């Protein structure tokens, strides 16, 4: 099973390589790369099953973010796991934001990786039908409200602008926190910004 690791932290590279080898992946099938251009070439050459990327490798350059977005779209059978570069926050969850794109904390546990990658590791094949997770999506109201929330508007302001009760705003905020698996506003904002960077944003149901 071909895999690619794009992370400038040698500790993370070592940890991921060790995990993959312990699960039966051969060392020669693990490719370390450093730049987005190298990633594009490696994905074309190896058709990897899984790619691990630290967002720090692309998030600071809009053209790199755009290229990552294109690479993810061009390789629908590859699972891309993007690690959030967020410090001093306890968050060890992961979210499927597209069929082939997971956003994850770097604190993800080996047994969580086993759950995600088990079938891929066994079958040595693409991801079709193997990730048994719901894709993150918000209702249209939740999506609009989240944007206002991120602009710094409070519950009362959102309530006035959307012409709904403050209690309803609080209820929607609770739903958003549940779906993104955290009560931490910093993590929620980070997930939204990262998703915006490498996709067209979190799915919003049009009803």
Swiss-Prot record:
Keyword Acetylation: no
Pfam families with a match to the protein in the record: GerE
Keywords on record: DNA-binding, Sensory transduction, Transcription, Transcription regulation
Superkingdom of origin: Bacteria
Residues annotated as domain HTH luxR-type: 131-196
InterPro entries linked: RcsA, Sig_transdc_resp-reg_C-effctor, Tscrpt_reg_LuxR_C, WH-like_DNA-bd_sf
Entry-linked Gene3D superfamilies: Winged helix-like DNA-binding domain superfamily/Winged helix DNA-binding domain (1.10.10.10)
GO molecular function, one term: DNA binding
Location of the DNA-binding region in this protein: 155-174
An example Gene Ontology biological process: regulation of DNA-templated transcription
Physiological role: Component of the Rcs signaling system, which controls transcription of numerous genes. Binds, with RcsB, to the RcsAB box to regulate expression of genes.
HAMAP family hit by this protein: RcsA (MF_00982)
UniProt family annotation: Belongs to the RcsA family.
Subunit architecture: Interacts with RcsB.
Identification of the protein by name: Transcriptional regulatory protein RcsA
Organism encoding this protein: Salmonella typhi
Taxonomy of the source species: Bacteria, Pseudomonadati, Pseudomonadota, Gammaproteobacteria, Enterobacterales
